[in-house]
Design a protein with these regions (language model features):
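Short, surface-exposed ligand- or partner-binding patches at beta-edge/loop junctions that are enriched
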Residues: 86-117
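Surface-exposed coil/turn segments at beta-strand junctions on protein surfaces, enriched
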Residues: 24, 80-84, 93-95
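Hydrophobic core residues within well-ordered beta-strands of beta-rich domains
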Residues: 4, 29-31, 85
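Beta-strand cores of secreted/periplasmic/IMS beta-sandwich domains, seen most often
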Residues: 28-41, 89-91
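Short, solvent-exposed beta-strand/turn "edge" segments of beta-rich domains on protein surfaces
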Residues: 12-30, 41, 78-80
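Membrane engagement elements in two modes
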Residues: 1-12, 22-24, 96-97, 115-125
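The feature marks short-to-medium sequence segments in extracytoplasmic or secretory-pathway proteins
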Residues: 36-85, 112-124
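Short strand-coil-strand connectors
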Residues: 1-2, 56, 105-109
Length: 125
Protein backbone atom coordinates (compact mmCIF):
# COMPACT_ATOMS: atom_id res chain seq x y z
CA UNK A 1 0.00 0.00 0.00
CA UNK A 2 2.41 2.62 -1.19
CA UNK A 3 4.99 3.43 1.47
CA UNK A 4 3.35 1.33 4.18
CA UNK A 5 3.56 -2.47 4.41
CA UNK A 6 1.12 -4.42 6.57
CA UNK A 7 1.56 -7.87 8.14
CA UNK A 8 -1.25 -9.78 9.85
CA UNK A 9 0.17 -12.08 12.57
CA UNK A 10 -3.04 -13.51 14.02
CA UNK A 11 -6.09 -12.78 16.14
CA UNK A 12 -7.52 -13.65 19.54
CA UNK A 13 -10.82 -13.30 21.36
CA UNK A 14 -11.23 -11.14 24.45
CA UNK A 15 -14.47 -11.36 26.44
CA UNK A 16 -13.96 -8.26 28.54
CA UNK A 17 -13.33 -7.59 32.21
CA UNK A 18 -15.31 -6.31 35.16
CA UNK A 19 -14.73 -2.77 33.86
CA UNK A 20 -15.26 -3.20 30.13
CA UNK A 21 -17.76 -5.54 28.46
CA UNK A 22 -18.89 -5.89 24.86
CA UNK A 23 -22.60 -5.50 24.12
CA UNK A 24 -24.84 -8.57 24.51
CA UNK A 25 -24.08 -11.09 21.73
CA UNK A 26 -20.72 -9.51 20.89
CA UNK A 27 -17.07 -10.26 21.63
CA UNK A 28 -13.86 -8.33 21.25
CA UNK A 29 -11.69 -9.43 18.35
CA UNK A 30 -8.05 -8.42 18.90
CA UNK A 31 -5.97 -8.48 15.72
CA UNK A 32 -2.17 -8.66 15.99
CA UNK A 33 -0.45 -6.76 13.17
CA UNK A 34 2.66 -4.86 12.09
CA UNK A 35 2.88 -1.73 9.95
CA UNK A 36 6.23 -0.95 8.30
CA UNK A 37 7.18 2.45 6.88
CA UNK A 38 9.15 1.79 3.70
CA UNK A 39 9.56 5.46 2.82
CA UNK A 40 12.38 7.88 3.63
CA UNK A 41 10.11 10.15 5.69
CA UNK A 42 7.97 9.71 8.80
CA UNK A 43 4.31 8.67 8.61
CA UNK A 44 1.45 9.00 11.07
CA UNK A 45 -0.41 5.77 11.86
CA UNK A 46 -4.02 5.96 13.07
CA UNK A 47 -5.86 2.76 13.97
CA UNK A 48 -9.18 4.65 14.00
CA UNK A 49 -8.69 6.06 10.49
CA UNK A 50 -6.84 3.24 8.72
CA UNK A 51 -8.54 0.03 9.89
CA UNK A 52 -12.04 -1.45 9.93
CA UNK A 53 -13.55 -4.93 10.13
CA UNK A 54 -16.55 -6.43 8.34
CA UNK A 55 -18.34 -9.54 9.61
CA UNK A 56 -19.85 -12.29 7.46
CA UNK A 57 -23.09 -10.28 7.20
CA UNK A 58 -21.12 -7.30 5.79
CA UNK A 59 -21.65 -5.18 8.93
CA UNK A 60 -18.73 -2.89 9.65
CA UNK A 61 -17.03 -2.41 13.00
CA UNK A 62 -14.62 0.35 13.85
CA UNK A 63 -11.79 0.11 16.36
CA UNK A 64 -13.31 -0.44 19.83
CA UNK A 65 -11.65 2.22 21.94
CA UNK A 66 -13.09 0.78 25.15
CA UNK A 67 -10.98 -2.37 24.84
CA UNK A 68 -7.76 -0.43 24.20
CA UNK A 69 -6.53 -0.92 27.76
CA UNK A 70 -6.35 -4.70 27.19
CA UNK A 71 -4.32 -4.77 23.98
CA UNK A 72 -0.63 -5.57 23.58
CA UNK A 73 0.94 -2.60 21.80
CA UNK A 74 -0.83 0.04 19.76
CA UNK A 75 -0.90 0.89 16.08
CA UNK A 76 -1.07 4.64 16.62
CA UNK A 77 1.49 7.42 16.45
CA UNK A 78 4.44 8.58 14.42
CA UNK A 79 6.38 5.92 12.52
CA UNK A 80 9.86 6.98 11.42
CA UNK A 81 11.38 6.20 8.03
CA UNK A 82 12.28 2.51 7.72
CA UNK A 83 10.72 1.64 11.09
CA UNK A 84 8.08 -0.91 12.15
CA UNK A 85 5.23 -0.72 14.65
CA UNK A 86 3.47 -3.81 16.05
CA UNK A 87 0.31 -3.91 18.11
CA UNK A 88 -3.24 -5.17 18.44
CA UNK A 89 -6.38 -3.69 16.94
CA UNK A 90 -9.52 -4.17 19.08
CA UNK A 91 -12.92 -4.55 17.38
CA UNK A 92 -16.33 -5.34 18.90
CA UNK A 93 -17.96 -7.91 16.62
CA UNK A 94 -20.93 -10.34 16.68
CA UNK A 95 -19.94 -13.49 18.59
CA UNK A 96 -21.67 -15.78 16.07
CA UNK A 97 -19.86 -14.55 12.94
CA UNK A 98 -17.87 -17.20 11.12
CA UNK A 99 -15.51 -14.92 9.23
CA UNK A 100 -14.28 -11.35 9.13
CA UNK A 101 -12.52 -9.06 6.69
CA UNK A 102 -9.92 -6.66 8.02
CA UNK A 103 -9.62 -3.61 5.78
CA UNK A 104 -6.37 -1.63 5.85
CA UNK A 105 -6.77 1.72 4.08
CA UNK A 106 -3.67 3.82 4.74
CA UNK A 107 -4.60 6.66 2.40
CA UNK A 108 -7.33 8.75 4.04
CA UNK A 109 -8.51 9.88 0.59
CA UNK A 110 -9.49 6.33 -0.34
CA UNK A 111 -6.88 5.52 -2.97
CA UNK A 112 -6.46 1.83 -2.28
CA UNK A 113 -6.98 -0.72 0.42
CA UNK A 114 -5.82 -4.18 1.40
CA UNK A 115 -8.34 -6.77 2.61
CA UNK A 116 -7.44 -9.75 4.82
CA UNK A 117 -9.81 -12.62 5.63
CA UNK A 118 -9.91 -13.93 9.20
CA UNK A 119 -11.88 -17.13 9.84
CA UNK A 120 -13.43 -17.66 13.29
CA UNK A 121 -11.84 -21.11 13.66
CA UNK A 122 -8.38 -19.52 13.26
CA UNK A 123 -8.90 -17.07 16.14
CA UNK A 124 -7.21 -18.01 19.42
CA UNK A 125 -9.21 -18.26 22.63
Amino acid sequence: MGDLAFTLHGARWYDGSEFIQPDEGNRYLLIDATVENKSDEGKTISSMMMFSVYDDEYRSADVAGGASSEIEGQLDGDLGAGRKMRGELPFEVPADSESFELVFEPDFLGFGQAIYEIRAEEIEG
